[in-house]
Amino acid sequence: MKIVGAEVFVTCPGRNFVTLKITTEDGITGLGDATLNGRELPVASYLTDHLCPQLIGRDARRIEDIWQFFYKGAYWRRGPVTMSAISAVDMALWDIKAKAANMPLYQLLGGASREGVMVYCHTTGHTIDDVLEDYARHKEQGFKAIRVQCGVPGMKTTYGMAKGKGLAYEPATKGQWPEEQLWSTEKYLDFTPKLFDAVRNTFGFNEHLLHDMHHRLTPIEAARFGKGIEDYRLFWMEDPTPAENQACFRLIRQHTVTPIAVGEVFNSIWDCKQLIEEQLIDYIRTTLTHAGGITGMRRIADFASLYQVRTGSHGPSDLSPVCMAAALHFDLWVPNFGVQEFMGYSEQMLEVFPHNWTFEGGYMHPGDKPGLGIEFDEKLAAKYPYDPAYLPVARLEDGTLWNW
């Protein structure tokens, strides 16, 4: 099954996505997502200039060999740009293999391990009352797992806070320069438990409650925070501190039983190894688009299962619907599944990427169409050219650059 074509598309139907399409001599096509928020063009260039020319003439069935060739053959291994490009190739090849076998990807992986994929949504607001209103709306829609983020009094903006009432959270800003946001750890630590208290007092403990700290705290601050919120029984606290120094998670673990989720910025199993091996986390957040595609994520999930660490993959709308389709197949199959992030997509985005997934009662299903069950409208995508946008940076109130 020889590869005869590999094309890269950068489109912005509301936000920028990088899509790879691989075509075989049999006319079978596969799609892969290579989106890296704020760094889309470097990934597109890496694919166009390096990987795509070396795909032509290869056997599309040799997925593992192609993965190893691009990973080991480049010498400069890992990193978000390289791994996003490899991920897209891998995703597209699995799409092709499943289509050739005339079965949905989850069946090719080994079949369903569950009836549906539990997904968590995002609730947000400038005030606690706004968050409670948004929470009620998502609860009514049937979500069983809900992330809560809120504006902090005394801070103009913070991570997870939508720009307007009823709007989805969108961190990236258009233009050639990232927005700078002020951050106060003290104000955050003082306020956030009040948010959890209001949610639990209003809605009880029927839904799983999640919260993203987005790398903002030091290890001892995260330990104190996690211990102080134990009565609210969070499903997880996400990215409490930057994960470059993974040993620091031992300090957090020693002081709290609040579950920890980490890994959305990881690119390979090596990034995950220590945290999983020492059981310093409960959920691994790596995503198909940034950690080597289906092939890379299988290695991570299999390794995590040895230590009873479950998956909780990153999945906001800054990853394209192609990634979401692939993730739902992976989630339906993987034995040690925990939860899947899902923000949803605009109608405009889904017109460019017609999909086959369904949502009902807090659970999603990828559908039974052969392959990933996702398509790409190239003509419509061409009407939405790339539009520069960047994630913000954070500074402390004294001007010190901080972790966004």
From Swiss-Prot:
Substrate binds at residues 37, 122, 264, 285, 314, 318, 341. The active site is at residues 159, 214. The record marks 316 as: Important for activity and substrate specificity. The keyword Lyase applies. Gene3D superfamilies: Enolase-like C-terminal domain, Enolase-like, N-terminal domain. GO terms for molecular function: magnesium ion binding; mannonate dehydratase activity. Binds 1 Mg(2+) ion per subunit. Mg(2+) binds at residues 212, 238, 264. It is an enzyme of class 4 (lyase). SMART domains: MR_MLE (SM00922). Its cofactor is Mg(2+). Keywords: Lyase, Magnesium, Metal-binding. Its EC number is 4.2.1.-, 4.2.1.8. The keyword Metal-binding applies. GO terms for biological process: amino acid catabolic process; carbohydrate catabolic process. InterPro entries: D-mannonate_dehydratase-like (IPR034589), D-mannonate_dehydratase_GalD (IPR053379), DgoD-like (IPR034593), Enolase-like_C_sf (IPR036849), Enolase-like_N (IPR029017), Enolase_C-like (IPR029065), Mandel_Rmase/mucon_lact_enz_CS (IPR018110), Mandelate_racemase_C (IPR013342). It catalyses: D-mannonate = 2-dehydro-3-deoxy-D-gluconate + H2O. Has low D-mannonate dehydratase activity (in vitro), suggesting that this is not a physiological substrate and that it has no significant role in D-mannonate degradation in vivo. Has no detectable activity with a panel of 70 other acid sugars (in vitro). Belongs to the mandelate racemase/muconate lactonizing enzyme family. GalD subfamily. This is D-galactonate dehydratase family member RspA. It comes from Salmonella gallinarum (strain 287/91 / NCTC 13346).
